[in-house]
C-alpha cells in the first residue's frame, strides 16, 4: 500500500485535490492549522499536509500507524472511528479519504458524529467515498467495501450529523463508463479479487491521467460539480 500511495496516479490525483483545499484553508485562517488525517493509511497524505500545520494521523491498523511513523509523522493514534472519541474541538481541518465506506465502520452516523465533535467551530471536513453500487466489483471485495454512495446519500449523512455542506461532487468523471465495463469483466473472470490500485500503468498513461485529474481538481476547488464519477468528494463545515 505504501508504494501505491507514493506512486499511483489515483492517489496522486486525490492528494492534489486535498492539498488544494487545505492550502486555501490555511490562507483563509492565516495561521498554522491543527489537522487530523482520519484513516491515514501509510501516511503519504500526512506528509503532504505537514507544511500547513500540526498533523495527526489516526488509523485502526497498527501496521498503517507504523508506516506513518516511519515517514517522520510524530503524532499518530490508533483509533476506531465508531467506538473511540477523537476529543472535542481539537482540529481546524479533518481529512477522511475513503474510510467511511469500509466494513469496519459499522455505524456511519456515529463515525461522522465523532468527526463533527473533533472539529472546531467553523472547521473544515474533507471526505471522499466510492460512488455508485453498480460499480461494485472485485476491487471492492479486495478492499473490504461495505457500500458505495450516491452524492445525495453522502450529503444527507453529513447534514444529519450537523455539517454544513459547502461542496459535494462526483470525481473522475471520464472514468465512470470504463469503470462500469471493467467491473463487469472482473466480476466474471473468477480469479482472486485484486484492488485496482495494485495494477500498473505505463508511465506515459499515468502522467496523462494525472494531468487530467489535476485539471478536474481545479474545477472542484472553485465549486464546480460533476454529474457522474467513480468517487464522491465533499467539503463541509461545522
What do these predicted regions represent?
Residues 47, 104-108, 137:
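Short N-terminal helix/helix-N-cap motif within the alpha/beta-hydrolase-1
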Residues 175-238:
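A C-terminal cap/extension of S-adenosyl-L-methionine-dependent methyltransferases
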Residues 125-147, 153-156:
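Short, glycine-/aromatic-enriched active-site segment of Class I SAM-dependent methyltransferases
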Residues 98-102:
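Short catalytic micro-motifs in class I SAM-dependent methyltransferases
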Residues 1-89, 93-97, 112, 219, ...:
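Conserved N-terminal segment of class I S-adenosyl-L-methionine
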Residues 109-124:
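A short glycine-rich, Lys/Arg-flanked "PGG" loop and its adjoining helix->strand segment in the class I
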Amino acid at each position: 500500500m505504501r508504494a501505491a500511495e507514493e506512486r499511483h496516479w489515483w492517489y496522486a490525483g486525490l492528494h492534489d485535490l486535498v492539498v488544494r483545499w487545505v492550502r486555501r484553508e490555511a490562507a483563509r485562517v492565516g495561521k498554522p492549522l491543527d489537522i487530523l488525517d482520519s484513516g491515514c493509511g501509510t501516511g503519504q497524505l500526512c506528509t503532504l499536509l505537514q507544511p500547513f500545520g500540526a498533523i495527526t494521523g489516526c488509523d485502526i491498523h497498527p501496521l498503517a500507524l507504523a508506516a506513518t511513523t516511519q515517514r517522520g509523522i510524530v503524532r499518530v493514534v490508533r483509533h476506531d472511528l465508531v467506538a473511540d472519541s477523537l476529543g472535542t474541538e481539537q482540529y481546524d481541518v479533518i481529512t477522511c479519504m475513503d474510510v467511511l465506506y469500509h466494513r469496519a465502520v459499522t455505524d456511519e452516523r456515529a463515525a461522522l458524529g465523532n468527526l463533527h465533535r473533533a472539529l472546531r467551530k467553523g472547521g473544515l471536513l474533507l471526505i471522499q467515498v466510492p460512488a455508485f453500487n453498480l460499480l461494485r466489483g472485485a476491487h471492492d471485495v479486495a478492499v473490504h467495501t461495505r457500500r458505495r454512495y450516491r452524492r445525495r446519500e453522502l450529503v444527507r449523512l453529513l447534514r444529519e450529523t450537523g455539517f454544513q455542506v459547502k461542496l459535494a461532487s462526483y470525481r473522475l468523471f471520464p472514468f465512470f463508463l470504463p469503470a462500469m465495463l471493467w467491473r463487469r469483466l472482473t466480476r466474471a473472470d473468477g480469479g482472486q479479487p485484486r484492488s485496482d490500485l495494485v495494477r500498473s500503468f505505463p508511465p506515459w498513461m499515468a502522467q496523462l491521467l494525472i494531468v487530467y485529474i489535476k485539471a478536474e481538481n481545479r474545477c472542484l476547488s472553485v465549486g464546480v460539480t460533476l454529474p457522474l464519477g467513480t468517487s464522491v468528494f465533499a467539503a463541509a463545515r461545522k
